[in-house]
Structure formats: C-alpha cells, structure tokens
Amino acid sequence: MKKLKTKVRSPGSATIINAISTGCGSAFGIQLYVKAEVQLKQGTEIECTSDQKVDSTLMEICAKNILNKLKINTGVKIHIQSNLPVASGLSSSSAVSNAVTMALTYALTDEYQINPKEVGLDDDGILNMAVDSSLEAGVTITGAYDDASASYYGGISITNNLKREIIRNENWNGQNILIYMPDKKSPTAEADVARMKLLAPWVKLAFHEVLKGNIHHALTLNGLLYCSALRFNPDIALDALEAGAVAAGLSGTGPSFVALTDDKNLSKVEDVWNSYPGRVILTKVDNQGTQVIASE
C-alpha cells in the first residue's frame, strides 16, 4: 500500500433559491472551503477527525459507500479542515460529502488501479454518491442537489433536485458577497418543512426569475419568503438593501444571510450588519468547484 495522502478542497455555497418548497433550486459556490485529507491504511477501520465540529457520521457514511461501491475492504483515515461554518445555511454538509467522496474515490482508484469512469465514478457519479451519503446521514431534506452541484462544479447551479438534473451551471463573476453569521446554528434537518411547503407558489415565481437571469431579484424574493416561514428577522436583509446591496436574503434554512454589493456600497452594508450580534464575512464567488489539491 502506497499510503498516499489525497487532499481535496470543496467550496460551500450560498442560496439563490431554496429547493425545499418546490424541489427546484439554485445556489452559487463561495470561497469558504472544506478540505478533506484521506489516507489508506491497514485493517478495516474508518477513522475520522476534524478541526471543527463536523459530523463524523457523515464522513463515515461517505467512506463506507465508496468502499462498498468499489467492493474494497481497507482502512481509511479521514481528516477535515474547514473555514466554512457548520449548520449555517452555507452548504457545509454538501461540501464535506463532496470533498470526502472525491478524495477517497481518487485514493482508492489510484491505489487499486481502477478507472473511475468504468465503475460509474466520473464527476456526475461522484456527485450523486455524495448526495446519497448526505441523505443517508440525515443532514439534508431534499439531497440538496442545488447546493451540492454548486459546491462540486463551482459557479451558479440551477437544478431540479427531485430529478437530480442540472438545468444550468455556469461561471459567475458577481459582486462582493457579504455573509452575516448570527451567534447560533440551524441544522437543515431540523427546519419546519410544512411551513416551507406553504411558500411553493411564490418560490416558483422566484425560480422563474433565476431562469431568466434575474439573480438579484430571485435571491432577494426567496430570502424574504423563507425568512417569514422560518421566523428569521427580515430586517437583516432589508437593512442591507437600504444600505445599497443589490440583493440580500436568508441562505438555505439559515441562520446565515447573504448580500451582494458593489465596491461603492460594500462598507455601508458591512457596517449595517456589524451592528447585529454575530460576525460578518466578506468573500467572492468560487468558480472552480471541488478539486484535488494534492496527492502526496
């Protein structure tokens, strides 16, 4: 056994359209990352560690599913590093699933000289395995195919989550992205699905906007709708818009809010959000997606 370390970096994503109410969604990659380091070892133990409170169950399920897919029995050591906040509405679970699934796929197919495409583990196959693992771990309601595909491929992803179909994926050079992080967590699996389903007719309107390319309108309308359903304070988004943001709203099922702003109004929006308890993060769109960064 070569005992190589395979390292993969996977970005989080922010919401344009939350898919929970209708099954169709949209998200874009952001430059906050999960890094997974995978090393094969003797035995059959799956050993998982992280520098954040990442769910080890999700990591173990990702590993187990790839090992079963390839019909390989071996020990695996997985370590996660991350500057992507967990349970925050920024697709941390999708990023972990993508990073671990890709890293272990590459490590195993290299060690055992397997062609990934011949066993159904091309990019689409890896992404689907990652989504399956997230569903099995119970960290997502719909599989979050919109979030997962934005994290995997980068840029903006528009999807039908129920069909696991990418309607459109493209690079996006958007404005500055500000993320407001309150001092609390909000796991997606604990969100009130029934209340979100009530939003379906209006979320469909927002989804049509994103299909037409009206990203700012779609993000804001979606974000305000889900604020209402999930009882988050819409003033957080409205204050950002009043300060000059071109779009603002809740990301995922919260508690994070995302705002898009040009350079001129960046400091104004940042100042407004800094008046709330919590922290504000400045980032950009990630157009690269999930990728191997080292194999050593």
What do the predicted segments below correspond to?
Residues 64-65, 101-110, 157, 208, ...:
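Short glycine/serine- and small hydrophobic-enriched flexible loop segments
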Residues 211-296:
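Glycine-rich, charge-dense phosphate/pyrophosphate-binding loop(s)
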Residues 124-166:
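Alpha/beta catalytic cores of group-transfer enzymes, especially the acyltransferase/condensing modules
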Residues 1-88, 272, 285-296:
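ATP-binding N-lobe of GHMP and related small-molecule kinases
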Residues 171-232, 238:
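Acyltransferase
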Residues 40, 182, 259-263:
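Short beta-strand-to-loop capping motifs
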Residues 90-119, 123, 154:
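DPxDG-like acidic metal-binding loop motif
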Residues 77-80, 114-133, 220-221:
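Beta-strand segments within the central parallel beta-sheet cores of soluble alpha/beta enzyme folds
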